[in-house]
Amino acid sequence: SLALMMVVLIFEFGSDYSTKLVLEGAFICFICPTAAAVAVVTEKLGGSIGSLTTYTVIANIFTMIIIPSLFPMVEKGADVSFLMMSAMVFRNVTTVLVVPLLLALLSRRFLPKWVDKVKNVKDLGFYMWCFNLTILMGETVRNMLHAEVSGVTMLLLLFVPLLVCLLQFAIGKTVGRHFGASISAGQALGQKNTVVGIWLTLTFLNPLAAVAPGAYVVWQNLVNGWQLWYKEKYGKLKW
């Protein structure tokens, strides 16, 4: 619904180039699927990995349907057919989500001793996530340096994702609190697969808007870092 709201705003105010650019950036931050690495942070925070993994798979499948439906309305130049765009999104989602999942299942089935050794390495998943984050941060800085936009537009592309990030974390935690799953719900809605978001922006929307999902990486991981610090210091989260 938030992504649909952004589509309406683009229709209403998209005649101005800079305004449309910022709105496209916000739109992609809303419509990005849940990050595959969300389970790493959720486990650290004490959330439910099982329910979150199920949600992540469902959310990524839903993304393959809704993105081809909305993108032609956001960017007129995105004249790729529904089936073609679905296939392209499916290929990307499969690469970052389904293939690692299948490899994990096959490893547990045929290489149980090796899996046990990997599981015994303390915080391995966390450090791998940090390594991936470093690459994404570098990509974000590169996009910023090469973006030919005004200073005001650049600031909006950097700070509008902060509002989007806080809003999605807040909505997820508020809804999840009613079901005793505020941590899992907050991470599910707030932690986005910005790799897919950047790819979608560069492929189908205005490439300059890719600064927004890149900035979202920074904000969501500042939120994650604060949560991890708070959990480590006080033993539980306040929100």
Regions found by a protein language model. Give the residues of each.
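Alpha-helical transmembrane segments of multi-pass small-molecule/ion transporters
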Residues: 1-239
